[in-house]
Amino acid sequence: MDNSTLVKPFKSINPWHMLGWLLVAQVMVAFIGRSLAPLGVLIGQDLALTKAQIGMLPAALFLGQSIASIPAGFIVDRIGSKRLLLYLSFGLGGAFMLMAISSNYFFVLLMVAIGGIGYGTMHPTSNKGILHWFQQKRGTAMGIKQMGVTLGSALSALLLLPLAAAWGWRMALLAACALLMATGVLAYRFYRDPPSAEPHEPERKISWSYLKESIGAMFRHKPLVLLSIAAMGLSGSQLILNTYIVLFAYEQLGLSLLLAGMLLVISEVSGSFGRVAWGIISDTIFKGQRLIVLVYIAALSIGIALMVTQLPEGISFWAIASVVAVFGFCISGFNGIWMNAATELVPFKQAGIASGFTLMVGSWGVIIGPPLFGYIVDLSGDFNYGWFFLSFVLLFVIVLLLWAKRLANKET
């Protein structure tokens, strides 16, 4: 770990105020991007989609994220976070507006993927902001910022699903996209990059040869590569839970659509608390040992996934909700620890591109995971086979994380 070249905070601005704007932007980006999970049932009914096709919607979003992650990380290392907050809000909002007025499934997938480019730009943009503004309590700050992802997802389930039931999913999504664009303008107006993050010419001119050199360095960094592959499993498992918990509860456990939607809210709210709690735990109890914390998260998630397979039809809502709450706390709470681990494994000046690299690799988990889970359920006719598949993936994740920790310890 080499973070010796740290940026001194800009004394006249409160870093927590800047964190507030990053959090607001993150909430709204997730509010739109993660709306595919709660709206998936209604979109599927409207377009007559199979479960595997519904799973392709978040997969397309994260395909866009994987395409954007490294270029976004490279650009934010050069121009800072402020302008990108505006650009990504309009990119995501505009693409989802076009998606909302189409009835062609393949055009919908294309617009979701283009929106994913804006969605994927948010993580390197906000991660760089956290690294610039926080030298202490960075795990806590990152957890608070990452809480915006699950909070935005929970709000989309809590607000967009009832609105979509009343107005139709298209009108509800159009209104939400307009709100995202307005938030992007406000974030651009009030967020500040510290002076040390400002671009300096000619040092900050974008060089594609330097980009290729930087990407090559990321691929040669074995602990970062192993962490990123492990993140594929963690991210895929998280999106499987978010994408299918409503369908699972509605179709297999017999809950109403409203109560099934509430399970997604519970999962995401629990994940929001998890992101902050795991950040505090990693800063205090584990003294910054992020990889070990990720091992604990994966192990707990395996236990909960196996417990889900034992839930009988007709079980009470509150019994299901308690299981889903713990599941969400773990599998939706890992992201801040992942981002901290990735950026702290590399020199500070490479933090943006390291974020982009690990997101690019990790995004393939959510591109492959939900459609594969849906295919397993379509083939078997039983969600339990899907949950067994998720447990096996997380077991492999633990092996990768322990390997990455061993290599990182050797390097230090």
Where are these regions (language model features)?
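Juxtamembrane intracellular "pre-TM" segments in multi-pass secondary transporters
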Residues: D2-S12, P194-L227
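Residue-level signature of mid-helix packing/kink "hotspots" within the transmembrane helices
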Residues: R34, F62-I70, S153-A154, E268-S272, ...
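Cytoplasmic helix-loop-helix junction between adjacent transmembrane helices
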Residues: M111-L151
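Helix-loop-helix hairpin linking two adjacent transmembrane segments in secondary transporters
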Residues: K145-P195
